[in-house]
Amino acid sequence: MLEALFLGLLQGLTEFLPISSSAHLRLAGEFLPKAGDPGATFTAITQIGTELAVLIYFRRDIARIAAAWLSKVIVRKEIPGSSPQDVRLGWMIIVGSIPIVVLGYLFQENIRNTFRSLWLIAIVMIVFGIILGIADKFGRSERDLKSLSSKHGIAYGLAQSLALVPGVSRSGATIAMGRILGYRRESALRYSFLLAIPAVFGSGLYELKTAIGESDPSAPYSLIETFGATIVAFIVGYAVIAWLMKFISTKSFMPFIIYRIVLGMTILLLLASGTINA
């Protein structure tokens, strides 16, 4: 149980930072007594905890967007005080979620196996760290969420799909795309949080249903241990969101970029020396 709780802590600490939580869980598994990959199922279910933190932290934004979208699209009647921008943002969350739903379904076997190679994780940690660094450095910071278009939503969605490979980082990829498109850091980060909700809940609930219906005796952690890790991820994740929103209002992503590159190089050295297995 302690191992699972530790991984839940790690999930909460890293999910929203552009450093890839799935890569950290995959790597940490190599150093724990139950050494090995915690698995895509464990990772997806614990991410439900961190997304619950998003729902609570952004509850007013989400409630406003959902109410405006439902009243306009389903009820066909605008509610007093609703904004066309909220309706549009609701559509952009849906549009931006399409790529990861399609690609996640098509590549689900690769997600469970091939994509979890530590060699691949180390390389993409470095490569996407450099990409995020360039995007953040030269991004124009002239757009906010009012500028979101269908093309930008799809671009964000394609970037999010890259995070199907551990090491890319969902937030890192979407933030980099936002900066490339000229969005301010706070706007890119906020949309990144909102965009992740459908994808993460969809993946997590699917894996949870599978885990309950098809018990896997080879799984390193039981459902009880996984649920415990999910609760820890929720608590820690909420604190990280609050900290990150304040941090990014005055700072750049450079500390995370340096960390990604250093960690990626460290993983390569550990693999090359035989200290850990891919």
Describe the residue ranges of each PLM region.
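Multi-pass membrane proteins that catalyze or facilitate reactions on polyprenyl-/lipid-phosphate substrates
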Residues: 1-278
